[in-house]
Amino acid sequence: MMKMRWLSAAVMLTLYTSSSWAFSIDDVAKQAQSLAGKGYETPKSNLPSVFRDMKYADYQQIQFNHDKAYWNNLKTPFKLEFYHQGMYFDTPVKINEVTATAVKRIKYSPDYFTFGDVQHDKDTVKDLGFAGFKVLYPINSKDKNDEIVSMLGASYFRVIGAGQVYGLSARGLAIDTALPSGEEFPRFKEFWIERPKPTDKRLTIYALLDSPRATGAYKFVVMPGRDTVVDVQSKIYLRDKVGKLGVAPLTSMFLFGPNQPSPANNYRPELHDSNGLSIHAGNGEWIWRPLNNPKHLAVSSFSMENPQGFGLLQRGRDFSRFEDLDDRYDLRPSAWVTPKGEWGKGSVELVEIPTNDETNDNIVAYWTPDQLPEPGKEMNFKYTITFSRDEDKLHAPDNAWVQQTRRSTGDVKQSNLIRQPDGTIAFVVDFTGAEMKKLPEDTPVTAQTSIGDNGEIVESTVRYNPVTKGWRLVMRVKVKDAKKTTEMRAALVNADQTLSETWSYQLPANE
């Protein structure tokens, strides 16, 4: 077992019995800061090979017994269930309950689980420990508990609101994402969960993060609802210098969509957990970056000071856009990060990784500061993450947003009305918004467009779209070198008034 250099749960239980005591993020931060001053200890697995080597289908057979949910016998709307170790979830995490007077370790027992056809020796699993946990809450119906939070693996967590299904993930911290040196994945090694009162509508979770070059203390306040909001506070300490620190990272999947259609016939028009990165820059500009599944690793960086927000969104909720009855991509949430306070100078970065199927999370977005403190110095970040299906509500009524981006072979209509390809690529971008819908259809809306050195805009037209009551931009571009990426931007204006967010698109190389 890993040597623990801090107070054991038993000692903590003895110390924290005073009625004046209250557990806080500072208690976790003391441990994180202490860890940062010592060498990293690689977590050790105690998992028998029958569990470590199992296939996903076998792991799925291990189910938590719902009748034994933690807090099942308490008058609280929140319940806890736990994940068993198995496959690559092969390292135990400690989970503690925090009450008004004490901290209590929640001990693993195989009796919490049903194992299906998985053969195991009870004596070898009696002290295994949990892989993670999930939170249940009656979010859709008062008489049914639904899973709303899942914390499993590294520093990943997934959250949903009412009427949503799991999609993208959030993380505690990302280190050296997309760098040649390879990414480092910090992990939550211990959790403290406050026992909620019967009338509580929020749940507080603390976590201790550890990795070879960073440690951290986290406080998550989960507020379930139509939109489930997670209030996050983190105190981060570097053990050693890092190439890139990713704060408030989001991880998602994009396989194909109308801006990058499937290369093979597929009954599903789109397949993704998210289809764009939205940014509210410090200067007030809104940016929409449609996602791609590139043939080569792509990193986009948006420099700014004091970002107002960013997120990976799933725009377009019509079932007909996905046609998937099993995975219901139309119900998967968007995640929006709202910083608290000033985060200073840095960049919102988007990483797009090639993938051949939907089982790989190939999209990452995060904030990376320009300047990092010396190892051991504390960094503080506070923000909320909103998991929502109401993406249009992010924007003020007078700020139109991109409803969809479609890509097509560029062509020109001949005198005989036959369309003839002309070697260009056409982008069809529909804008809509609350105030835009009120504009007369003869409003002289135009587009401000630009393209990088690797392309040329051959034609750009804007016309009223009576179906969406918005405006459609059609832009035909010619790429100079197909082996290079091509950057382009566009926004709608009426005279000197900007009507929309900025559409910022990168045409991947070799497309």
From Swiss-Prot:
GO terms for biological process: beta-glucan biosynthetic process. Residues 1-22 form the signal peptide. The keyword Signal applies. InterPro entries: Gal_mutarotase_sf_dom (IPR011013), GH-type_carb-bd (IPR014718), Glucan_biosyn_MdoG/MdoD (IPR014438), Glucan_biosyn_MdoG_C (IPR007444), Ig-like_fold (IPR013783), Ig_E-set (IPR014756), MdoG_OpgG (IPR023704). One of its GO terms (cellular component) is outer membrane-bounded periplasmic space. It is found in: Periplasm. Keywords: Periplasm, Signal. It holds the Pfam family MdoG. It comes from the Bacteria. GO terms for molecular function: carbohydrate binding; catalytic activity. Pathway: Glycan metabolism; osmoregulated periplasmic glucan (OPG) biosynthesis. The keyword Membrane does not apply. Involved in the biosynthesis of osmoregulated periplasmic glucans (OPGs). HAMAP family: MdoG_OpgG. Belongs to the OpgD/OpgG family. Contains a large N-terminal domain that would serve as the catalytic core subunit, and a smaller C-terminal domain that would act to modulate this enzymatic activity. This is Glucans biosynthesis protein G.
